[in-house]
């Protein structure tokens, strides 16, 4: 029941906060509950409902993303009314969903008679790369004279999705989390914890859960075999600089993506509008295993190997 959702969700938030991790992303059923509450928001809960639909619903082609995109599309087109989300705001939120179920609605909104709505749809498409065959739908509108579609095509041609991003700084001040010896992916993403890999924040708690030779006392696992040195890593982050993960040999083994997810959970930055996923971070090693290196790069990190 939608009426019971918020209390259940708050209980879930409390349970996860005890572990020091954020709540899970919304499921399709939870997203539907949020939407029902948005249609008639309980007094005092307006802010949390906006937070949930904006930041806690998955992007892409997740089932929950389909529910979210369908509702936002209806609001943006004006077939659904929402006191908390205007048509322009709905179009803007569609543009944060990266690709998947949001693409068709945004392309349709390029024809909207309200300029502010069409402008928001165009802005979202300019920063969306996962278009696949629907690129041709935008091109077709541009060829027929749609000015918003033309602006999207020109933006893609100019690679504004890339050039609009901050430049790589000349220098970066880092705090080092140094781990001696060879670090394999099982140190970062233990096989016995494979069941939790889809839940990145929870799985990351197992990183370095087993002690290593020559390990400093403060970097020992908080609970051997269960929980890694989370407080120690947090103390490094509290210094105010990016934390660089540093090792002698880093990333040997087979679980490259889940291992990367764990490292980036502690050293990276939140991906805007995408719950429980991070990008960025710095990884330094005398030697970084090639596939782990590539996976770090693909995840938006900066791996540097000096051999």
Question: Can you annotate each of these PLM segments?
Answer:
Residues 2-35:
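Amphipathic alpha-helical packing elements
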Residues 9, 86-87, 102-103:
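N-terminal alpha-helical segment
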Residues 15, 41, 233-237:
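Short secondary-structure boundary/capping segments within folded domains
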Residues 22-24, 46-62, 77, 84-99, ...:
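Structural detector for internal amphipathic alpha-helices that build alpha-solenoid repeat scaffolds
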Residues 28-36, 59-78, 99-111, 130-142:
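Amphipathic alpha-helical scaffolding segments comprising HEAT/armadillo-like alpha-solenoid repeats
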Residues 36-45:
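Short, contiguous, helix-prone interaction/anchoring segments in small proteins
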Residues 42, 82-83, 113-115, 146:
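Short inter-helical turns and helix N-cap capping residues of alpha-solenoid HEAT/ARM repeat scaffolds
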Residues 95-96, 102, 109-110, 117-307:
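Fe-S-dependent hydro-lyases/dehydratases of central metabolism
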């Amino acid at each position: 029941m939608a009426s019971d959702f918020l209390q259940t969700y708050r209980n879930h938030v409390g349970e996860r906060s005890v572990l020091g991790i954020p709540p899970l992303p919304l499921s399709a059923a939870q997203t539907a509950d949020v939407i029902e509450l948005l249609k008639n928001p309980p007094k005092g809960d307006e802010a949390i409902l906006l937070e949930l639909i904006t930041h806690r619903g998955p992007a892409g082609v997740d089932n929950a993303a389909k529910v979210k995109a369908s509702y936002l599309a209806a609001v943006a087109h004006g077939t659904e009314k929402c006191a908390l989300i205007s048509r322009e705001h709905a179009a803007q939120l569609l543009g944060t969903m990266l690709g998947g179920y949001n693409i068709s609605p945004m392309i349709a909104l390029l024809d909207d008679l309200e300029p502010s709505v069409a402008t928001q749809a165009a802005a979202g498409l300019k920063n969306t790369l996962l278009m696949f065959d629907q690129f041709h739908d935008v091109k077709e509108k541009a060829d027929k004279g749609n000015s918003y579609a033309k602006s999207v095509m020109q933006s893609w041609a100019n690679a504004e999705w890339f050039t609009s991003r901050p430049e790589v700084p000349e220098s970066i001040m880092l705090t080092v989390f140094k781990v001696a010896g060879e670090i394999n992916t099982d140190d970062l993403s233990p096989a016995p914890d494979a069941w939790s890999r889809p839940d990145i924040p929870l799985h990351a708690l197992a990183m370095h859960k087993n002690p290593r030779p020559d390990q400093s006392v403060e970097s020992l696992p908080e609970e051997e075999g269960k929980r890694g040195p989370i407080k120690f890593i947090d103390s490094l982050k509290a210094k105010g600089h990016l934390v660089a993960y540093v090792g002698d040999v880093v990333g040997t083994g087979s679980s490259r993506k889940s291992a990367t997810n764990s490292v980036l959970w502690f050293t990276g930055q939140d991906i805007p509008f995408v719950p429980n996923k991070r990008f960025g971070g710095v990884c330094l090693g005398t030697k970084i295993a090639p596939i782990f290196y590539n996976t770090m790069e693909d995840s938006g990190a900066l791996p540097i190997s000096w051999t």
